[in-house]
């Protein structure tokens, strides 16, 4: 059982340690804790006994353990605070014209990695929830073509493919017609299901040879099922993570899955501190926060760093970036949905 004073001591030690990265002694706490040095030492000993503090090898001071950071995140972290002193700099960073969603997400990721010194990942709306709103096929040459998908009337995904040997021009038109009739207006999850259930039967009515058509469907839609993900500060992993974690970030789709699995449907924010799960991120801290993408759903910002982070400062910064990012995205999508020639 941690008393109120012991919790104050733990919070203060974490605050000092994350700024100095030096063990903290009882004398450093006396100005802020209204108790004698002996009482503070006794409380520190009790916190150590409970596994929340640990001794330093080169000093008589104490530093927070992984369990101490976990306790702090669970009991003391304020998720609603804003870093008001940094609002201006963050707003200024977004004061530019962006031409696509990925550029806005990249700016948010770059900004957070500059502020934190950590690795940052930004995710678009979950692919399965996005809706196909337009489709076309562009012939590039005698044997190649490009499938062009528009999701949520704003995001474009392309897939180049080799036209099957037995395909005629009219077969490409059939393919385009089937996709437009059967898939437009449906979510990516629905489309994934239809490709495996309805499409095999439908193409038998339109094509003499069906095997290569099924394979073609699988190929051109594969990219649409992938996460839209941007990263910043991957090199920072070399300062606090092992090689396996660094190499894990060469697989963006797996990174996206790991981040989504760490944030439940009903959660808007979460902090994982060395949760010990079988993961390349098990020994790291992951701060995840959802942000609104107007008219479409929610995205996720995730900061990946060492356990000994200044969690409160990072949460404050993430909160500000989230709010400014949502404002910028609202303006971006309002422009997209308006009549271009009426916008001044």
From Swiss-Prot:
> Can you tell me which family this protein belongs to?
Belongs to the HrcA family.
* Protein keywords: Repressor, Stress response, Transcription, Transcription regulation
The record describes the protein's role as: Negative regulator of class I heat shock genes (grpE-dnaK-dnaJ and groELS operons). Prevents heat-shock induction of these operons.
Species annotation? Streptococcus pneumoniae (strain Hungary19A-6)
Q: What processes in GO biological process is this protein linked to? A: negative regulation of DNA-templated transcription
Listed name of the protein = Heat-inducible transcription repressor HrcA
NCBIfam families per the UniProt record, alphabetical: hrcA
What one GO molecular function would you report for this record? DNA binding
